[in-house]
Amino acid sequence: MGVLEKIRDIEAEMARTQKNKATEYHLGLLKAKLARYRAELLEGSSGGASKAGAGFDVAKAGFGRAVLIGFPSVGKSTLLSKVTSTESAAAAYAFTTLVAVPGVLEIEGAKIQLLDLPGIIEGAASGRGRGRQVVAVAKTADLVCIMLDATKPDDQRRQLEHELEEIGIRLNRQPPDVVFKQKTAGGITINCTVPLTKTDERTVRGILQAYKIHNADVMIREDITADDLIDTILGNRKYVPCLYVYNKIDSISLEEVDRLAREPHTVVISCELDLNLEVLKKRIWQKMGFNRIYTKKRGAEPDLMDPLIIKKTEATMEAVCDSIHRGIKHKFKYAVVWGKSSKFNPQGQRVGLTHKVAQDDVVSIVTKV
């Protein structure tokens, strides 16, 4: 029996099994097996991925990468040509884009690579069409933009989320707060700092055994599910922010536009009428989580034309130094910062390498002679 057949059998058994406290352990083991077989399926295809055609090995460019993912003919190519200087072939029929087409989106002084990927079809993660390659490229992204047709049913969104989930991409989620450490002896030790309501210790041990893990320390700091534990054990999941972009709002009612616009992580646009494209750009910038930092030489005005772009999660003075030149931090003496992160704003504050900078701060770095 092949891997695909095993996956289908497990999915069928899970569909037949009622979800309750009595079946929790059994379902947990089935999920562990399913995740293992899906990983085997993807690893088995990775060797031939580079030979499958041109256009998928696209080098990263700019300060980050956002990918456009969606079913064929939702308007990804049109959007790319509208917001970047790149032309991606667009037509009124499906499967126009056959390779990954990169463009550069300029927002708030930052250049962000925007990739128009071939249209995903249902079953992509199982190898249909070129979908598995498409979703694998999405794993390299700093932001996923799922493009949807506002005139079509809501299940298109669920199908795309399912395909991305199967390939190991987790949208708008944080990694589970679980510390998992394998060891050579001593058995399984499980410590929980919170009550577990979505799984139990027996299921946790069963999942570990399903992966042939017999010696490990597990510290659980949040109320996790069996899926969260499996994600932690595998360690190859990608947690990515996601924007849901509904196109063709010029073809639906105002009430429907209002309903979609109120959904979380959602932007509504019309490529045909150029509606909300600037709003989309701003939301992409916000979702990617960048800080714009300006530099200032001693005795000179701040350089407002060429800002440094730094991820908010890494926005320390050390990261500012690395953005200029990696050798600067070794000669660093101190820095003066003006802006939101300064205690004395609008006056400057003298800070060290660990100081966290904020959006639109101005920094002046003093080095040792």
Located regions from the model:
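Conserved G1/Walker A P-loop phosphate-binding module
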Residues: G2-Y211
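C-terminal-of-GTPase-core extension/linker across diverse P-loop GTPases
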Residues: R16, A22-G64, I69, V74, ...
